[in-house]
Amino acid sequence: MKQYYIVALIVIATLLLTNCKKAGSGDENPQETFDPTPLELIIPQGFPDMVIPDDNPLTVEGVALGRLLFYDEILSGNDSQSCATCHSQSFAFSDNGKQTSEGIDGIKGDRNAPAVINIGWLPSLFWDGRAKTIEEQALGPVPNPIEMHLEWTDAEI
């Protein structure tokens, strides 16, 4: 019986040792690529073409990620606000007709949140027009101390 355990230990040790690899042995692929799925945008009749930046093309995966981030409260300083808090889908992605939007910790803003429908065709965003692209606009509310109050360094994974 003792010989059986010794043989079993030798077999197990041999299997373990032959399956061990040195880090950097060449089997891993650090240049793994991801090929996102292009999203075909169907533009309604009468609408002009939408300007889509070359460095940020529409993809199925990008739209899915955007939807998740839009509804995720983790992008606020106390995990209580998402973009959808002030841009409610139930109210045409607006702030339910409120005169001023309420941000983190109940702080009232200076304006209400504009509706975010068909924004791909708008020449500028925010009420004062300071953002010229959707990508530029997305950087504003998260670190804003009245709106979501989360530093980008704290949002990084």
Regions found by a protein language model. Give the residues of each.
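N-terminal secretory signal peptides that target proteins for export/translocation
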Residues: 1-2
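Periplasmic c-type cytochrome electron-transfer domains
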Residues: 5, 18-157
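Bacterial N-terminal signal peptides
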Residues: 8-16
